[in-house]
Regions:
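Conserved short histidine dyad/triad with adjacent acidic residue
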Residues: 132-150, 165-175, 210
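Short, conserved beta-strand element in jelly-roll/cupin
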Residues: 153-165, 171, 181-187, 233
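N-terminal leader/propeptide segments of preproteins
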Residues: 50-67
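A short, N-terminal "cap"/entry segment at the start of jelly-roll beta-barrel domains
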Residues: 67-134, 145
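A short hydrophobic beta-strand segment most commonly corresponding to one strand
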Residues: 205-206, 224-238
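Bacterial Sec-dependent N-terminal signal peptides
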Residues: 1-54
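Double-stranded beta-helix
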Residues: 176-199
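Conserved metal-binding segment of the jelly-roll/cupin
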Residues: 198-219
C-alpha cells in the first residue's frame, strides 16, 4: 500500500511539472465563461462541445488582432506554398510569433527556399537558428496503433508535402494522462468518439501548441498511406 501511494504521489508530482497537460485548468476556464451564468443548460452545452485548444473568446480584441495579423501575411517571410489549416489556433500563432520572431522567421524562410520533395530524409539544421527540420518519409497507420501526445516546451509545426496524413485532436474534458510527463511529451487516454479528425495535404500546414493534444500519422480513407512530412519543433515561450 505504501509503495502504491508513493507511485501515485510520484505521478502527481510529474504532472504538476507540466501544467499545460492537465485538463482541469483548461476545462474550468472553458466552462467558466458559460457556467458563470449559473444555468445547468449552459454548463451542459459547454461539456458537450468539448475543449480542443486554448480558448481566447473572452478577449475578442486579441482574436481580431490575430486574425488581422494572419491575413496580412508578413509572418510568411516568402512562404506561399501553403496556408494554416482551419484548426490552427491563430491567437496562439500570433502570440508565439511575437515572443519568438527569430525562430519563426527562420522556419518560414527555410521552407520557402527549400525544395522539400528533393531534400534528403532525416534531420537537418535550419541555417541562422537552433532549429532542426525532420524530414520523414513514413506511412500512416490505423488509429488504434497511433498514440496521442502534447508538448509543454515545444510547438509542433507539421507540413505534409506529399500524400495525405490524417491528424486527430482530442477533447480535454474526456481525456486524461496515462503516463508520467517525460520532457517533452505526455500521452493520454481519450474518447475516440469525441476526437476531431483532419486530413492534411500539401496546401495546408498544422501547428500544435501545448493546448492542442494531438494524434499524427493516422490512416486516411485512400489506398495510399505513404507520406512525406516535415516536422519542426519551435520553442514555446510563456
Amino acid at each position: 500500500m505504501k509503495k502504491m501511494r508513493l507511485m501515485s504521489l510520484s505521478l502527481m508530482a510529474a504532472l504538476a511539472m507540466a501544467p499545460a497537460f492537465t485538463a482541469s485548468a483548461q476545462c474550468k476556464k472553458a466552462e467558466s465563461s458559460c457556467c458563470k451564468k449559473n444555468t445547468d443548460a449552459c454548463c451542459k452545452d459547454a461539456k458537450q462541445e468539448g475543449v480542443y485548444t486554448q480558448d481566447y473568446s473572452n478577449d475578442p480584441k486579441l482574436v481580431k488582432a490575430a486574425q488581422k495579423w494572419y491575413k496580412k501575411g508578413k509572418w510568411r517571410n516568402g512562404f506561399k506554398k501553403a496556408d494554416a489549416h482551419s484548426s490552427v489556433n491563430l491567437v496562439d500563432f500570433y502570440l508565439q510569433y511575437q515572443k519568438n520572431p527569430e525562430q519563426w522567421k527562420a522556419l518560414f524562410d527555410f521552407i520557402a527556399k527549400t525544395d522539400l520533395l528533393a531534400i534528403p530524409g532525416g534531420k537537418h539544421p535550419i541555417p541562422g537558428s537552433n532549429l532542426t527540420i525532420s524530414v520523414e518519409d513514413s506511412k500512416n497507420n490505423p488509429l488504434e496503433k497511433r498514440g496521442s501526445e502534447s508538448h509543454y516546451h515545444h510547438i509542433d509545426f507539421q507540413y505534409v508535402v506529399k500524400g495525405v496524413e490524417r491528424f486527430g485532436i482530442i477533447d480535454h474534458l474526456t481525456s486524461k494522462p496515462n503516463c508520467k510527463y517525460r520532457p517533452d511529451v505526455i500521452h493520454y487516454d481519450y474518447d475516440k468518439s469525441r476526437a476531431r479528425f483532419y486530413d492534411s495535404t500539401p496546401d495546408k500546414f498544422f501547428i500544435f501548441f501545448p493546448g492542442d493534444w494531438h494524434i499524427a500519422k493516422i490512416a486516411n480513407d485512400t489506398d495510399n498511406q505513404d507520406i512525406r512530412v516535415i516536422v519542426i519543433k519551435v520553442d514555446y515561450k510563456d
